[in-house]
Amino acid sequence: MEYSSKLRFAVSCSSNMNRSMEAHGILKKRGFNIESYGSGNQVKMPGPTVDKPNCYEFGPTTYEDIYADLTNKDLHLYTQNGLLHMVDRNRRIKSRPQRFQAETREFDIVLCLEERVFDQVVDFLNRSVGKSGNPVHVINIDIEDNAEEATFGAFFVADLCEKLERSEDFEEDIDQIITDLEENNPKRNLLHTICFY
């Protein structure tokens, strides 16, 4: 696929279901070179009760599998709470949830959508035996895990990506771009660090 962006972006939430997929969809429509991931051990989604989540394995499980499973378990519940709508959106963007720690491709920028995910991604990158030595900028943007915040947050992520993409030298400008966004959005908990592949 041809991308209009020069930078390689990744976006990660915990399960590659809600926040990262909302951002992936918007960035993909805008022509960014974007991939999305989860950083957790499993794909976890709300179940019939708080103590009974629906859990799926990263790797073999497709969004189609998840859609069929939720439909078979309780069509009414998962239609009412929006999960089927969310999974339907996801299967139109890509085939399956992916785990960041299983990815071998390199990115220029990894956007994490909560601090716990940021910590997991940074820990993974710092523990990995580097091959290329290429830098990767890891940025945290806190986005609450619900449909409305995922949408607002995705536009915030897209705004950040557009600013980075337009920069003549994003490596030089990234700190100022983040500082400017943080001043206008103090609740987003923007964090930034550099790791190496």
UniProtKB/Swiss-Prot annotation:
Changing residue 145 to A: No obvious phenotype. Fails to suppress abnormal synapse and axon formation in a sydn-1 and syd-2 mutant background. It holds the Pfam family Ssu72. May be phosphorylated by kin-20. It catalyses: O-phospho-L-seryl-[protein] + H2O = L-seryl-[protein] + phosphate; O-phospho-L-threonyl-[protein] + H2O = L-threonyl-[protein] + phosphate. It comes from the Eukaryota. Expressed in epidermis, intestine and nervous system. GO terms for cellular component: mRNA cleavage and polyadenylation specificity factor complex. Gene3D superfamilies: 3.40.50.2300. Its EC number is 3.1.3.16. Keywords: Hydrolase, mRNA processing, Nucleus, Phosphoprotein, Protein phosphatase. The modification Phosphoserine is found at residue 39. One of its GO terms (biological process) is regulation of locomotion. It is found in: Nucleus. Protein phosphatase that dephosphorylates 'Ser-5' of the heptad repeats YSPTSPS in the C-terminal domain of the large RNA polymerase II subunit ama-1. By regulating the phosphorylation status of ama-1 and thus ama-1 binding to specific polyadenylation sites, regulates alternative polyadenylation of pre-mRNAs, including unc-44 and dlk-1 mRNAs. This results in the tissue-specific expression of unc-44 isoforms. May interact with synd-1 (via C-terminus); the interaction may prevent ssup-72 binding to RNA polymerase II ama-1. May interact with RNA polymerase II ama-1. Belongs to the SSU72 phosphatase family. This is RNA polymerase II subunit A C-terminal domain phosphatase ssup-72. It comes from Caenorhabditis elegans. The lineage of its organism: Eukaryota, Metazoa, Ecdysozoa, Nematoda, Chromadorea. The gene is ssup-72.
